Amino acid sequence: MTQRLKTVYYETIVPKLKEQFNYTNIHQVPKVIKVTVNRGLGDASQNAKALESSIAELATITGQKPVVTRARKAIAGFKIRKGMPVGVMVTLRSERMYAFLDRLISLALPRIRDFRGISGNSFDGRGNYSLGIREQLIFPEIDYDKIDQIRGMDISIITTAQTDEEGRALLTEMGMPFRK
């Protein structure tokens, strides 16, 4: 079963962007390659229960088991040693990526309190977009009673776009609610 957002991309977004940027080939049109969802544990790195709950939450939100990221070197100021878990990360591609993006754009982002759109300044200069989410409760899959602490996450959307303008056009057509 193909995802709704993938169908919309190939049927409406590709022809629109091809005309807007005067591409000669359909493969020049920017597309989303992958979405990475990252959560740093911070002070919870000493707590094994916080690590397990973070893994479970990210698996529920993304539909894929996260990888535990570990410290590369010891930092005494942060009380971490080499090899200690410092975060969890998921890389989504193809069908799961489109499913996650669809849920993020149409369900999760509108549930943010006092939501007026996301900032358009978070592009990296190469057409990739990053956004931070302050609480995991905006996702409908998360049960309010089952969370021990409100934690945020970082979401990076990596595209084949060459410029920020192309990346913004792609994400706007996909329905990303940028602030005016």
From Swiss-Prot:
Q: What is the official name of this protein in its record?
A: Large ribosomal subunit protein uL5
Q: How does it assemble?
A: Part of the 50S ribosomal subunit; part of the 5S rRNA/L5/L18/L25 subcomplex. Contacts the 5S rRNA and the P site tRNA. Forms a bridge to the 30S subunit in the 70S ribosome.
Q: Which domain of life is it from?
A: Bacteria
Q: What is the lineage of its organism?
A: Bacteria, Bacillati, Cyanobacteriota, Cyanophyceae, Oscillatoriophycideae
What's in the GO CC field?
ribonucleoprotein complex; ribosome
Pfam families in alphabetical order? Ribosomal_L5, Ribosomal_L5_C
Keywords tagged on the record: Ribonucleoprotein, Ribosomal protein, RNA-binding, rRNA-binding, tRNA-binding
Question: What's the encoding gene here?
Answer: rplE
Q: What species was this sequence derived from?
A: Gloeothece citriformis (strain PCC 7424)
Q: State the similarity comment.
A: Belongs to the universal ribosomal protein uL5 family.
The answer, when asked if Nucleus is one of the entry's keywords, is no
What terms describe the molecular function in GO for this protein?
A: rRNA binding; structural constituent of ribosome; tRNA binding
- Function description: This is one of the proteins that bind and probably mediate the attachment of the 5S RNA into the large ribosomal subunit, where it forms part of the central protuberance. In the 70S ribosome it contacts protein S13 of the 30S subunit (bridge B1b), connecting the 2 subunits; this bridge is implicated in subunit movement. Contacts the P site tRNA; the 5S rRNA and some of its associated proteins might help stabilize positioning of ribosome-bound tRNAs.
What GO terms in the biological process aspect are recorded for it? translation
* Alphabetized PANTHER family for the sequence: 60S RIBOSOMAL PROTEIN L11-RELATED (PTHR11994)
Q: Which InterPro entries match?
A: Ribosomal_uL5 (IPR002132), Ribosomal_uL5_bac-type (IPR020930), Ribosomal_uL5_C (IPR031309), Ribosomal_uL5_CS (IPR020929), Ribosomal_uL5_dom_sf (IPR022803), Ribosomal_uL5_N (IPR031310)
